[in-house]
Amino acid sequence: MTATAARAGTNPVEQAVIWLNDPLNWTNPGGILDRLGEHLSMSAAAVLLGCLVAWPIGLWLGHSGRGGGLVLLISNVTLAIPTLALLTILPLTFLGFGRPAVVVALAVFAVPPLLANAYTGVRQADPEARDAARGMGLSGGQLLRRVELPLAVPYLAAGFRTAAVQVVATAALASFVNGGGLGQIIRAGFGLDIAAGGGQIIAGGVLVAGLALLVEGVLALVERAVTPRPLRRARGRANRRAAAAVTGN
C-alpha cells in the first residue's frame, strides 16, 4: 500500500480503488502483472496434472462399468483433505517450499470433479451406440476411443471447468508457502498495519475473485460449444425441475 493511498482516506474500499489504479502496482517487479502470470501458470500446471491423473482412471472405470464406489471414495477422500493442510505438509517433503509443492496440492484438489465427470460421461454414453460399435467388431479400446470418449466430451468439459475455477480461487493460498501468485498481494497487505494495508488486502481479494469469475465465464462458453444442442436442452429441463423442487413450485 502506497503512502498516497493511505493518506487518501481511511475507507479500505477507497484505498483499494486507489491501489488498483496506481500503474506502478501493475508494472513494478512483483506487481499485479507478475503475480497474475505466476497465478495462471501454477493453476494451469495443477489442472493439467489433475487431468493426467484423473481422466485416464475415470474413463477406464467408466468404460469397464466397475469402480463407481472407488470413484466416489477417491472424490470424497480428496475433498476431505484441506488444501491448506496439503500446502503445509508437502513443502516438508522432497518437493520443498515453492511452486512444485503448490502445484501438487492444487492438483489433488482438482481431481474430484475431473474424475467424477470422466466416469459419469462414459457411463452416460448411449447404450445403442455401444452395441452398434460392438456389432462392427470394435475392441474395448477402440470402443472407448471412437465412441465413448467423444460422447463424454461435454462431461469432461464440465469437470474441467469446475476444477479450473476451484484451483484458480484456491491458488491464492500458495503465498503461505512462498508459491507466489495473486495471494502474495493479500499476504503483503496483512504484513502492514490495517490502516495502511486494508485496501491492498481488498484489492488482492478482488483480483482473485475477478480472475476466478473470468475463468468461469470463458470455460462456460467452451463447455456450451462442445455440448450438443439436445443435451443442452435436456440439462436445462433438469435444472428447471431441480429449481422447482427446491422452491416447491
PLM region descriptions:
Residues 1-19, 30, 217-249:
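Transmembrane alpha-helical segments of polytopic membrane transport and secretion proteins
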Residues 2-47, 194:
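Periplasmic/extracellular loop-to-transmembrane helix junction in inner-membrane transport proteins
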Residues 31-42, 91-113, 153, 200-204:
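Loop-to-helix entry region at the N-terminal start of transmembrane alpha-helices
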Residues 44, 140-174, 203:
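Transmembrane alpha-helices
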